[in-house]
Amino acid sequence: MNLHEYQGKQIFAKYKLPVSQGIACKTADEAVEAIKQLKGDAWAIKCQVHAGGRGKAGGVKLVRNEAEVREFADKWLGKRLVTFQTDANGQPVNTLYVEETAGIARELYLGAVIDRSSQKVVFMASSAGGMNIEEVAAKTPELLHKVAIDPLVGGMAYQGRELAFKLGLTGDQIKQFSFIFTQLAKLFVEKDLSLLEINPLVVTTEGNLLCLDAKMVVDGNALYRQPELAAMHDPSQDDPREALAESHQLNYVALDGNIGCMVNGAGLAMGTMDIVKLHGGFPANFLDVGGGATKERVAEAFKIILSDKAVKAVLVNIFGGIVRCDLIADGIIAAVNEVGVNVPVVVRLEGNNAELGREILAKSGLNIIAAATLTDAAVEAVKAAGGK
């Protein structure tokens, strides 16, 4: 689950991390009132969306008076911001964050992720702050420094000092950075995060460190023990189809293609998407109905796929292990009868009750293309969607 920048900074403040004073605003009037409460003669006003690249897309601006604040608020509130990390529709802007500014001498990067191979939290720091960190890693890997956190002892001050030296920090900045590092390591574990980024972490013209941004992603599997963070969830940033799928215990991710995919098992779902791409097609989604799929859940999955108007064909690929293929067949028929289908449906059933499932579909009178193998299914789906 993603958090907004202003929410992340609220949490940072509780961990005594250096952040600018700021106010989250829902209306233009609130934004105008905010600059009256904040210090300084210039302020940063930022669109709050779950995506990076806001600055380049015009979603961040330095403002100096009430007129500029109101102009920015009127331009963005209730609109959608499109960045390189969003789809063509962008993300809705319902909140603006107005904060005090500071003179910037240097921009650094500091972030943390879970490294599955080492089974540890790994912190990354770079002197190339304010840039896309993936680009830094690809083009100038020597500027990216890493340190792994021992889960038994947590982040240690000496690790922070080592990173500070590599970043070229001096004097009291080293002490400041070490404190920020150890507090972030503590925060990462205590809040069950899967990703944490400060980009940029700046050195101000006064020589102090300041967290100018805050990106936090909470492990969705841990939300049951993070009620404070769960309450921060902003459903307006979610794809409505993904939210609906979650309510039916379906794993769904919307994509940009035109071949809807319904599969049981995440691995098989990814393999199905790969083979569709291999044969020249473009998946419209990732959808895993799970091992305990019921007739009702399959019907809902089918309806969610068909709600995407870009879908030109549907590929159903089921390997019956725990889930029974005849239940899948019943669910497909129920969904087709309820929603109505005007696109070709390609079905490949294998495993538990596969023969019965195929028989049910054959007797249904529906226009379904049966496939014996996964390759055949992918080829037929691409052809049905208008591909080669």
From Swiss-Prot:
Question: Which enzyme class, named as a word?
Answer: ligase
Q: Which GO terms describe its biological process?
A: succinyl-CoA metabolic process; tricarboxylic acid cycle
Q: How does it assemble?
A: Heterotetramer of two alpha and two beta subunits.
For this UniProt entry, the molecular function terms from Gene Ontology, in alphabetical order, are: ATP binding; magnesium ion binding; succinate-CoA ligase (ADP-forming) activity; succinate-CoA ligase (GDP-forming) activity
Give the residues the record marks as binding Mg(2+): 199, 213
Give the protein name, as stated in the record.
Succinate--CoA ligase [ADP-forming] subunit beta
The free-text cofactor remark is: Binds 1 Mg(2+) ion per subunit.
Q: Which PANTHER family match?
A: SUCCINATE--COA LIGASE [GDP-FORMING] SUBUNIT BETA, MITOCHONDRIAL, SUCCINYL-COA SYNTHETASE BETA CHAIN
State where substrate binds. Answer: 264, 321-323
UniProt keyword list: ATP-binding, Ligase, Magnesium, Metal-binding, Nucleotide-binding, Tricarboxylic acid cycle
Gene Ontology annotations for the cellular component aspect, listed alphabetically: cytosol; succinate-CoA ligase complex
Q: Which reaction does it catalyse?
A: succinate + ATP + CoA = succinyl-CoA + ADP + phosphate; GTP + succinate + CoA = succinyl-CoA + GDP + phosphate
